[in-house]
């Protein structure tokens, strides 16, 4: 009987988990140039493999960077990280402190976490904004899961089925990631990101000279578990480009480039290192860095040069000497310890007290005192006031001690004493 109740308790505990696995809510947005955003169960809970399966179920694919840029130009923006082809991004038009760290453009996140939302691209959607309700998941197959599509206008459409083809995604459907907005203090980023802009045509890939790209890095932080991959692109001779903690040197002889590790400056401020990009893009350098895929790859497969903590703006700042672009690290301001501040405050207080004591002592020492000689009996305080008033003129004398130098010689003193003695004798005889 005890076993029965034990199993029943376990069953009740696992029931909410099984129900959660049998229900999936998919919140989708309007389509902009075919691109739309999908959020699962109100939190970041989609893996990269599940993102591809989910877009496939909507008869769509993961969008490329070109398609995201096109959707951005049509007015598409969100405040949620989502997968695209090769990246995790947020499209932003208006700057917001809690969205993409207040940046605009297609903000590319570099992170070591694995669950986000996803973006999908439907090639058959209109080129402009399309907010018609989605009522079906056409490419889903049979399954026990109740899938509910929640449109932007609030309409809901449900069907039973399944779209996940990877068992690890099905088993990990109970994984809960924090639902956070980008740019907040709890952002799921450990290494920062950079923004993909399209309005400064400064870098041209060698395979297609008609599509300009501009990649501006926004945070120079240490990548942990990031993806470095291959870098390349048209660069001039005698140039140096900083690549995610490496420096690629291109000598004047235009031979193979070399990679030299460099240490990024952790100053807490956003620095800018600008690199010159020449018109001649016949010189191609393709270096291999650790990792499987670079977050700076062009969507068409062409390599673009990304500098972490810098912007490629078409002109150079810094000294180029012997084929190297040197940038100086900003000096750090020393911080005053708290104990030193407390000690200085105590010393100042002690100095103020010492000055006050010295001033008070000087006042006391400078006071004048009078010496009163009373010829009456008893103390002055014990006598009556009438007696004191009547005898004040008679009995009180001011005694002045005057130090006078003797002006007479010893012989004169002796003569004066003898004269006095004779006078005293005469007075006694007379009496």
UniProtKB/Swiss-Prot annotation:
Comp. bias intervals (Basic and acidic residues): 158-169
Carbohydrate-modified residues: 27, 59, 102, 112, 122, 174, 182, 256, 325
Keyword RNA-binding attached: no
Residues engaged in binding hyaluronan: 43, 80-81, 107
Chain spans, region Disordered: 158-191, 219-243, 279-333, 376-396
Extracellular side: 23-338
TM stretches of this protein: 339-359
Pfam families: Xlink (PF00193)
Cytoplasmic-facing ranges: 360-431
Stretches with biased composition (Polar residues): 302-329
Source organism superkingdom: Eukaryota
Places the protein is found: Cell membrane; Cell projection, Microvillus; Secreted
Listed SUPFAM superfamilies: C-type lectin-like
Gene Ontology MF: a single term: cytokine receptor activity
Biased composition (Low complexity): 181-191
Link domain segment(s): 34-122
Function: Cell-surface receptor that plays a role in cell-cell interactions, cell adhesion and migration, helping them to sense and respond to changes in the tissue microenvironment. Participates thereby in a wide variety of cellular functions including the activation, recirculation and homing of T-lymphocytes, hematopoiesis, inflammation and response to bacterial infection.
Record protein name field: CD44 antigen
Organism from which the protein derives: Mesocricetus auratus
Gene name linked to the record: CD44
